[in-house]
Amino acid sequence: MSIDKKQREKLERLGEHIKTLRKEKGLTLKELSHSINKDPQSIHRLEKGQVNPSYLYLVDLCIGLNIN
């Protein structure tokens, strides 16, 4: 299924926010990926707004970033 422009913009904003949070926590892509057992490339693609993450992926990110 194709993603429209508004959805793409939302994914890009989400990715930017995740990247900002990761950097504020002082984590590299590799460190975050290791802590949540995900591939660093998948997190990179998420931060670039190139993928639509599942709910469980977002839960894992919240745990890895220590977000309540």
What is each PLM-predicted segment?
Residues S2-E24:
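A short, Lys/Arg-rich alpha-helix, primarily the initiator
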Residues N37-V51:
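Recognition helix of helix-turn-helix/homeodomain-like DNA-binding domains
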Residues Q50-I63:
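Short, basic-rich loop-to-helix N-cap that marks the start of a DNA-contacting helix
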Residues E16-S35, D60:
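Short basic helix-loop element that most often maps to the first helix and adjoining turn
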